[in-house]
Design a protein with these regions (language model features):
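Membrane-embedded alpha-helical bundles of multi-pass transporters/translocases
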Residues: 1-344
């Protein structure tokens, strides 16, 4: 197979992989809204989900190259193929176990409404629209920053040999942040906590802008704290999705679980794409070229793109979420009303 056909093959198979994965991930994500009707338990569910998901990511990152070496025995091409095959089979088994042994505790009565009607009804759900906008801006700014992390370490800090340590430290911060979401939600209103966390993320991003290049340990610490506080908000966001579903039931009697999660996941995927694209556009704008000595202006552009632009994104998310009207008091009322109706 020549190089052109290899590229076409890689593009087609990767696109199909993402389509299938998204088709699996939407009902998997929606499980968080039907495993429990308790808003606090939903935060706990999402915390466990993201902690173990990120641990899995860390495990894959750590094990991939050793497995490639072991399976390939000198043939890296064969090593990668067999490693991906093993990981894919393991993923399928884990998905099957998940769907086989989870039990939905929130009923989702069937209805015969057309997709057009469902979308019209969903568009009346104001909290849902707020979450869509917040998810889009949030993921765009997060992906922008994480994409540029390696460029920041290599060109701004001048420590290419520490890229792996920098990224790994960020992943550890992500895991610890997700684990702390549940204790935080018990002490603060979920809406207020989410807004505060966005402002903290913005402040930490701005602090990173002023960290001198020679203070590598401080740069690592600030990035760790940014990952910690940013990811602490992630389980709260996913728990809020279930709250907007309950709001829709309370508002019009329709539980559109699948459509809500599918729609918000669409905006999340759009944010992922935009964040990666904007990172590339900014690198081009600041005249980045690989494997050459970069000008101070280019390095300054990378620093600004890694710190200040994501900070603006976090502030925008916080401002958007101030319009979100489902605080803990409102959610408790909605939950009580729905429980009373279900008992009639």
């Amino acid at each position: 197979m020549d190089d052109t056909n290899k590229i076409i093959y890689a593009f087609v198979t990767y696109t199909l992989l993402m389509l299938v994965y998204t088709a699996i991930n939407i009902p998997y994500s929606a499980l968080g809204g039907v495993l429990s009707g308790n808003p606090n338990e939903r935060v706990s569910i999402q915390s466990y989900r993201f902690v173990f998901g990120m641990l899995g990511g860390l495990l894959v990152t750590s094990c991939t190259l050793p497995l490639v070496k072991w399976f390939g025995n000198g043939n890296n091409e064969m090593g990668y193929q067999l490693t991906m095959l093993v990981m894919s089979c393991l993923g399928v088994v884990l998905f099957l176990i998940c769907f086989r042994y989870t039990k939905e505790r929130v009923s989702n009565p069937p209805h015969k409404l057309s997709l057009k009607t469902q979308l019209h009804v969903l568009w009346q759900n104001q909290p849902f629209k707020i979450l869509c906008m917040a998810a889009l801006v949030l993921l765009t700014s997060m992906v922008l920053r994480t994409t540029l992390a390696i460029y920041y370490v290599k060109y701004v800090l001048g420590k290419e040999d520490l890229i792996t340590e920098f990224v790994t430290l960020g992943m550890i911060g992500n895991i610890l942040g997700c684990a702390c979401a549940q204790p935080l939600s018990k002490r603060l209103d979920k809406k207020a906590a989410y807004v505060y966390l966005q402002y903290i993320s913005a402040i930490l991003s701005c602090i990173a802008f002023f960290v001198p290049n020679e203070h590598v340990l401080l740069a690592f610490l600030v990035y760790f704290l940014w990952c910690f506080f940013t990811q602490m908000a992630t389980p709260l966001l996913w728990a809020k999705m279930a709250d907007t579903i309950d709001y829709g039931v309370w508002q019009n009697g329709l539980r559109l679980t699948g459509l809500v999660y599918a729609s918000i996941v669409f905006f999340i995927k759009l944010g992922l794409a935009l964040g990666g694209a904007i990172a590339g556009w900014l690198l081009a704008y600041y005249q980045y070229q690989a494997n050459v000595e970069l000008s101070e202006a280019t390095k300054s552009g990378i620093l600004t793109s890694f710190t200040l632009y994501p900070a603006i994104g976090s502030i925008l998310v916080a401002l958007i979420m101030t319009k979100y009207n489902l605080d803990n008091k409102t959610i408790k009322k909605i939950t009580a009303d729905l429980t009373q109706k279900s008992n009639l």
